[in-house]
């Protein structure tokens, strides 16, 4: 085991507009090439579109969308005696959030709307209604874990 102290997770500053750490993380996931101001514009525009269409608070819809995309179990590859098994494991809360945000952004990028803000808004609305590509990704991961339940005793 290493003798050095374990490095803790960095504190993230909440975003300036809504004062939310979750939103600040989401902005960082959207950001490309260090262009944070562009990422902020995309997120805020998407949240405005969502609030306009849903008639609910911005962050409530975002939280609902992320709740419907968060995975509870995933599979990890484990090599046992020459063969590799897909072992189902529970997902830590921090990783759940990270995966949900990543899947939501990936699904939004694959959509067909004109701007990224509209794509993200559409995917958030779909995810909050429990449909869409990001939710399908979560269902696939859960299905994979369910199919490999027999190897759960290899967990570490």
UniProtKB/Swiss-Prot annotation:
Record's keyword terms, sorted: Ribonucleoprotein, Ribosomal protein, RNA-binding, rRNA-binding, tRNA-binding
Keyword DNA-binding appears in the UniProt entry: no
GO-annotated cellular components: small ribosomal subunit
Gene Ontology terms describing biological process: translation
Keyword set includes tRNA-binding: yes
GO terms assigned for molecular function: rRNA binding; structural constituent of ribosome; tRNA binding
Highest taxon above the source species: Bacteria
SUPFAM superfamilies: Ribosomal protein S7
Alphabetical list of PROSITE patterns matching this protein: RIBOSOMAL_S7
One Pfam family matching this protein: Ribosomal_S7
InterPro entries: Ribosomal_uS7, Ribosomal_uS7_bac/org-type, Ribosomal_uS7_CS, Ribosomal_uS7_dom, Ribosomal_uS7_dom_sf
Function: One of the primary rRNA binding proteins, it binds directly to 16S rRNA where it nucleates assembly of the head domain of the 30S subunit. Is located at the subunit interface close to the decoding center, probably blocks exit of the E-site tRNA.
PANTHER family: RIBOSOMAL PROTEIN S7
Record-stated family: Belongs to the universal ribosomal protein uS7 family.
Subunit structure: Part of the 30S ribosomal subunit. Contacts proteins S9 and S11.
Record-linked NCBIfam families: rpsG_bact
Protein name, entry field: Small ribosomal subunit protein uS7
Organism of origin: Shewanella amazonensis (strain ATCC BAA-1098 / SB2B)
Lineage: Bacteria, Pseudomonadati, Pseudomonadota, Gammaproteobacteria, Alteromonadales
């Amino acid at each position: 085991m290493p003798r050095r102290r374990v490095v803790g997770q960095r504190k993230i500053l909440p975003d300036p507009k809504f004062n939310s750490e979750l939103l600040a993380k989401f902005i960082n996931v959207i950001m490309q090439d260090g262009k944070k101001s562009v990422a902020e514009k995309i997120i805020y525009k998407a949240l405005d579109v969502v609030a306009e269409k849903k008639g609910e608070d911005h962050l409530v819809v975002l939280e609902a969308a992320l709740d419907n995309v968060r995975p509870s179990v995933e599979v990890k590859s484990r090599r046992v005696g020459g063969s590799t098994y897909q072992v189902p494991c529970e997902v830590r809360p921090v990783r759940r959030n990270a995966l949900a945000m990543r899947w939501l952004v990936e699904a939004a990028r694959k959509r067909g709307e004109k701007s990224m803000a509209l794509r993200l808004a559409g995917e958030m609305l779909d995810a909050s209604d429990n449909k869409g590509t990001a939710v399908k990704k979560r269902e696939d991961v859960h299905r994979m874990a369910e199919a490999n339940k027999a190897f759960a005793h290899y967990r570490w």
